[in-house]
């Protein structure tokens, strides 16, 4: 049953006479404590926070002095006491509450400055189970929730970035804080505890291999606010989950304009794709527009791979995202800047390459320090009206699959290499996806069509356009291989690929008409390999 309210009006301005400071992150702590003292605020504190404040010569009272109880159990119990929570939760205009705190000698607390044990940091650094559990804060979230609930009389600060605003408001209002400001801080406080609990919940689900927990929490910390979202009439912000997977969220931006919503979405897609290619084996480049590849290629150098990728669809590559699986060097940079490019993302960039890119001031250059592991576990989430779709990350890798040759003719070694290449790319193309590949480069990509045969036809037409632009006598689909992200429901998609010039096919299989498709391949002397793994992408 819901708890009823006494409807006691909150004051607009509330004087801050007493503050409780208990922080794990001590950034800005001393300057903030000095400012509070200068504004006549009595400071209560705990453990290491109290020691830091006292060492700076600022008057501070240890919380054990008001509880009459020392810290116990390695600090697990220090603020879980009525003298603390009564001071945070007391409604100052309620006669019953006033009588209770007077009877029990509880002093009111007007400002709670709390930040939490670094659970998220420990989690993503791979701390062992016991260490991770020990970094679950109990008293901190309890104080944050108590003070934020009682924002009518208490201001709650959970982020050192807000210290300056608190001091400014105190000085502006002669030692008081306004209700609107206290509400704003309370909203942030509850968001913080929600995100913290979400991190704990998700870690526990992973720790016990619970793939579909009863309650699923997704949370992040605001990194940046964009000018707009996918379209100019939409608002947008970028939130970081704390996962250390190399990519756009963890990258260092060396130059260029702020990343837009679409930039981030496309850059993530590009870097995840190029990570499918082992940099110890080959250099690889992916060019992306609208989260779909315009061209992907591998070669002995990044420059060569870029030129091969660009040749697949030079028109669509204009204004695209370029992702590399190796360090950006001068030779590659000189080629990339010849075409208008929004973002370059790579594990690293040489000083010479940075100097070349610097000539294009708006071009964003991101370095990540590494590549994401395509085999790593993780989750992918998507909102729908009234719900959240959550699934495990598509971490299937073609090199790990048991490939089955189902036709009379087996692919040659060169065809098999290209087939694997094509299937890697197809995993990152919006369904229905058809990818033509020849000599380690895409030569035609058909994406996002409602029928597979249309994707095959579009990919072939793209190859024809690229050949015409390059002055070639015939499109490079002649003698190529083809990948399909899902099975061919009919033989028509396969026959379109054959018409385009494909000599070998890789697909998951699993259609009711697999026999018909295999027979059509045999009839045309096509080698076909089935993977048993589908890669739908929506």
Swiss-Prot record:
Residue ranges of every copy of the MGS-like domain listed in the record: 6-158
Presence of keyword Cell inner membrane: no
EC number: 2.1.2.3, 3.5.4.10
Pathway as given in its UniProt record: Purine metabolism; IMP biosynthesis via de novo pathway; 5-formamido-1-(5-phospho-D-ribosyl)imidazole-4-carboxamide from 5-amino-1-(5-phospho-D-ribosyl)imidazole-4-carboxamide (10-formyl THF route): step 1/1; Purine metabolism; IMP biosynthesis via de novo pathway; IMP from 5-formamido-1-(5-phospho-D-ribosyl)imidazole-4-carboxamide: step 1/1
Catalysed reactions, as listed in the record: (6R)-10-formyltetrahydrofolate + 5-amino-1-(5-phospho-beta-D-ribosyl)imidazole-4-carboxamide = 5-formamido-1-(5-phospho-D-ribosyl)imidazole-4-carboxamide + (6S)-5,6,7,8-tetrahydrofolate; IMP + H2O = 5-formamido-1-(5-phospho-D-ribosyl)imidazole-4-carboxamide
GO cellular component, one term: cytosol
GO molecular function, one term: phosphoribosylaminoimidazolecarboxamide formyltransferase activity
InterPro entries: AICAR_Tfase_dup_dom_sf (IPR024051), Cytidine_deaminase-like (IPR016193), MGS-like_dom (IPR011607), MGS-like_dom_sf (IPR036914), PurH-like (IPR002695)
Pfam families named among the record's database cross-references: AICARFT_IMPCHas (PF01808), MGS (PF02142)
GO biological process, one term: 'de novo' IMP biosynthetic process
Keywords: Hydrolase, Multifunctional enzyme, Purine biosynthesis, Transferase
Hydrolase among keywords: yes
Family: Belongs to the PurH family.
NCBIfam families: PRK00881.1, purH
Swiss-Prot/TrEMBL domain comment: The IMP cyclohydrolase activity resides in the N-terminal region.
Protein name listed in UniProt: Bifunctional purine biosynthesis protein PurH
């Amino acid at each position: 049953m819901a708890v009823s309210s006494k409807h006691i009006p909150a004051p607009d301005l509330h004087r801050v006479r007493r503050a409780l400071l208990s922080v794990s992150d001590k950034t800005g702590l001393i300057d903030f404590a000095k400012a509070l003292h200068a504004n006549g605020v009595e400071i209560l504190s705990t453990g290491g926070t109290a020691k830091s404040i006292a060492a700076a010569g600022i008057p501070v009272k240890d919380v054990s002095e008001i509880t009459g109880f020392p810290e116990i159990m390695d600090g697990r119990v220090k603020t879980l006491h009525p003298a603390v929570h009564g001071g945070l939760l007391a409604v100052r205009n309620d006669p019953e509450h006033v009588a209770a705190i007077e009877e029990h000698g509880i002093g009111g607390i007007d400002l709670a400055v709390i930040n939490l044990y670094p659970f998220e940091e420990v989690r993503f650094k791979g701390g062992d189970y016991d260490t991770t559990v020990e970094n679950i804060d109990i008293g901190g979230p309890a104080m944050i929730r108590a003070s934020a609930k009682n924002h009518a009389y208490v201001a709650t600060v959970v982020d050192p970035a807000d210290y300056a605003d608190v001091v400014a408001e105190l000085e502006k209002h002669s030692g008081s804080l306004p209700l609107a400001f206290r509400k704003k801080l309370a909203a942030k406080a509850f968001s913080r505890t929600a995100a913290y609990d979400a991190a704990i919940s998700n870690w526990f689900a992973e720790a016990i291999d619970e793939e579909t927990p009863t309650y699923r929490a997704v949370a992040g910390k605001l990194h940046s606010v964009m000018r707009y979202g996918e379209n100019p009439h939409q608002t947008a912000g970028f939130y970081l989950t704390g996962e250390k997977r190399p990519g756009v969220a963890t990258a260092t931006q060396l130059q260029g304009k702020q990343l837009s919503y679409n930039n981030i979405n496309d850059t993530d897609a590009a870097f995840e794709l190029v990570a499918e290619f082992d940099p110890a084996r080959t250099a690889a480049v992916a060019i992306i527009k609208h989260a779909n590849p315009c061209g992907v290629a591998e070669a002995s150098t990044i420059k060569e791979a870029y030129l091969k990728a660009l040749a697949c669809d030079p028109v669509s590559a204009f204004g695209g995202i370029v992702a590399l699986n190796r360090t950006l060097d001068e030779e590659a940079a000189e080629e990339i800047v010849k075409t208008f490019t929004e973002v370059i993302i790579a594990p690293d960039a040489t000083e010479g390459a940075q100097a070349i890119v610097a000539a294009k001031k708006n071009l964003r250059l991101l370095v990540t320090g590494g590549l994401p592991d395509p085999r790593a576990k993780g989750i992918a989430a998507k909102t729908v009206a009234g719900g959240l779709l959550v699934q495990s990350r598509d971490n299937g890798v073609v090199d790990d699959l048991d490939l089955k040759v189902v036709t009379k003719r087996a692919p040659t070694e060169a065809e098999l290499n290209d087939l694997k290449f094509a299937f890697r790319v197809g995993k990152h193309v919006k369904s229905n996806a058809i990818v033509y590949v020849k000599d380690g480069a895409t030569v035609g990509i058909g994406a996002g069509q409602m029928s597979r045969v249309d994707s095959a036809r579009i990919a072939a037409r793209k190859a024809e356009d690229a050949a015409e632009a390059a002055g070639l006598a015939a499109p490079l689909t002649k003698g190529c291989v083809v990948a399909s992200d899902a099975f061919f429901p009919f033989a028509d998609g396969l026959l379109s690929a054959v018409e385009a010039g494909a000599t070998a096919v890789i697909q998951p299989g699993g259609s009711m008409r697999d026999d018909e498709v295999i027979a059509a391949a045999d009839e045309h002397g096509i080698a076909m390999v089935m993977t048993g793994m589908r890669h739908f992408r929506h």
